[in-house]
């Protein structure tokens, strides 16, 4: 298996090196949806998310990867950022653990599924081990240096009723502005202003008769 593992590492490094050189800094969310109901219980949970971690690892919750366990935010956390994180690959540390094992610093959790042979006309199936990312929600106290992490929300405080107050002005790293409600609002407002300005300028041109007639 060591040969296949080395091949995997080579391919991952090759892809990351090429993509990073072509577009450095390309990481963040292209989609993010928070469970607003759990905020009232003092917990943070992700319903769906898609994007790239800073180390180039793609994630897709819940289609390809399980959503991280909800984080019961510590009441002492104030003006702190909660991150979506994955342990960094380190020499001498297991990359993969079996389902049910302690995750530790593993980057993949293996589970067995029945796979169909797409090239056979027969209903031929076989058990296939599939690895998913054991993503988790952490804060700075959990050690960001050992993780590829991107900020999800900034928690202002945990109120006396245990609900979470989030900083609405916080914008996480993004690949698509549609993943952020504030940025989407700014974009739509700007497009609306540009449209109004364009209509006003067009009206002035027509009113002044400054139109050119082109003939072949």
Give the role of each language-model region.
Residues 67-203:
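Internal, hydrophobic cores of structured domains that mediate oligomerization or house catalytic pockets
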Residues 1-45:
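N-terminal "first-domain core" detector
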Residues 214-215:
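Conserved small/polar residues in nucleotide/adenosyl-binding loops
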Residues 48-52, 155:
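Short polybasic amphipathic segments
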Residues 37, 54, 64, 87:
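Acidic/polar N-terminal loop/beta-strand segments that form early-domain functional surfaces
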Residues 30, 47, 57, 80-82:
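Structural beta-strand/beta-sheet cores of well-ordered domains, especially the beta-sheet scaffolds
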Residues 57-71:
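Short linear interaction motifs
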């Amino acid at each position: 298996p060591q040969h296949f593992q080395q091949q995997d590492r080579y391919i991952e490094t090759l892809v990351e090196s090429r993509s990073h050189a072509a577009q450095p800094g390309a990481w963040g969310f292209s989609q993010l949806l928070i469970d607003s109901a759990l905020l009232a219980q003092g917990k943070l949970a992700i319903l769906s998310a898609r994007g790239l971690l800073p180390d180039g690892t793609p994630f897709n919750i819940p289609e390809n990867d399980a959503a991280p366990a909800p984080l019961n935010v510590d009441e002492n956390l104030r003006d702190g950022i909660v991150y979506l994180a994955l342990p960094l690959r380190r020499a001498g540390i297991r990359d993969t653990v079996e389902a049910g094992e302690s995750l530790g610093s593993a980057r993949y959790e293996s589970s067995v599924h029945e796979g169909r042979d797409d090239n056979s006309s027969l209903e031929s199936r076989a058990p296939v081990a599939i690895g998913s990312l054991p993503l988790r929600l952490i804060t700075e106290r959990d050690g960001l240096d050992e993780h590829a992490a991107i900020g999800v929300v900034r928690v202002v405080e945990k109120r006396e009723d245990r609900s979470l107050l989030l900083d609405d002005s916080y914008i996480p790293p993004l690949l698509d502005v549609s993943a952020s409600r504030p940025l989407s609002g700014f974009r739509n407002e700007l497009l609306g202003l540009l449209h109004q300005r364009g209509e006003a300028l067009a009206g002035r041109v027509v009113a002044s008769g400054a139109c050119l007639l082109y003939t072949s």
